[in-house]
């Protein structure tokens, strides 16, 4: 990726669409909240297994959730760290949200067996659309930086056996179901994506494994 492209990709939790949703209260009706079960009265612990630009994690944290962000790309991890640091210095309100976000650099497939949470979310690089003009420039830049996610089925398998109450897969609205995994318990549709929700019948054993938010070493 060129230096120009790299500089065009940034993590911003204050301005743009993220800031607007926070200021306007529009985030409260987001389909992701319904899929995860997160609300102001139910501040769950969520592991975002594919943090990306961190927007979904910030949305969940803004509603009171404690969120652990796992990102395996060194470049994207660095962008997230910069974005979190900048957001923390913006205002007391934003700093309080960021304080509920813990960033870890690593492969979620290896980390998930060592952690527990109420919810695990997975938002892989979605299959490329045939009409590339429909793909936002930002997502094209991100795809150039990290490439595709050919191992998404393996990641989902790791998530489905993790110590959590449910797994939420973010997937294109009209795309075929992800092959190689079991059928979701139910689906929640958004405007352009859907959330495939996999409910685990057993709650995680609280004493068996550390909760990811206890890993203060990785907190930003």
From Swiss-Prot:
Looking up Pfam families in the UniProt record yields: SAM_MT
Q: Which reaction does it catalyse?
A: guanosine(1516) in 16S rRNA + S-adenosyl-L-methionine = N(2)-methylguanosine(1516) in 16S rRNA + S-adenosyl-L-homocysteine + H(+)
A molecular function (GO) held by this record is: rRNA (guanine-N2-)-methyltransferase activity
Q: Has keyword rRNA processing? A: yes
What are the binding positions for S-adenosyl-L-methionine in this chain?
55-56, 71-72, 123
EC number(s) from the headed UniProt entry: 2.1.1.242
| Record-level GO cellular component terms | cytoplasm
Q: Which UniProt keywords apply?
A: Cytoplasm, Methyltransferase, rRNA processing, S-adenosyl-L-methionine, Transferase
Q: What is its main location?
A: cytoplasm
Role of this protein: Specifically methylates the guanosine in position 1516 of 16S rRNA.
Family designation: Belongs to the methyltransferase superfamily. RsmJ family.
- Could you tell me what this protein is called? Ribosomal RNA small subunit methyltransferase J
Q: Which organism is it from?
A: Rhodopseudomonas palustris (strain BisB5)
């Amino acid at each position: 990726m060129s230096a120009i492209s790299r500089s065009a990709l940034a993590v911003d939790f204050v301005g743009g669409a993220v800031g607007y949703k926070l200021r306007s209260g529009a985030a409260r009706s987001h389909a992701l909240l319904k899929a995860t079960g997160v609300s102001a009265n139910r501040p769950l612990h969520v592991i975002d297994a594919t943090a990306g630009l961190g927007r979904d994690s910030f949305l969940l944290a803004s509603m009171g959730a404690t969120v652990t962000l796992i990102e395996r790309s060194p470049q994207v991890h660095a962008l997230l760290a910069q974005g979190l640091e900048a957001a923390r210095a913006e205002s007391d309100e934003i700093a309080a949200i960021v304080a509920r976000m813990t960033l870890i650099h690593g492969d979620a497939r290896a980390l998930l067996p060592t952690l527990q949470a109420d919810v695990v979310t997975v938002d892989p690089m979605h299959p490329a659309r045939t009409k590339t003009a429909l793909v936002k420039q930002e997502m094209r830049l991100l795809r150039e930086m990290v490439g595709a996610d050919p191992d998404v089925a393996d990641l989902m398998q790791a998530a489905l056996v993790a110590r959590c109450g449910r797994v939420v897969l973010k997937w294109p609205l009209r795309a075929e179901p992800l092959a190689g995994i079991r059928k979701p318990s139910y689906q929640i549709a958004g405007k352009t994506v859907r959330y495939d929700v996999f409910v685990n019948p057993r709650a995680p054993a609280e004493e068996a494994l550390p909760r990811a938010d206890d890993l203060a070493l990785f907190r930003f």
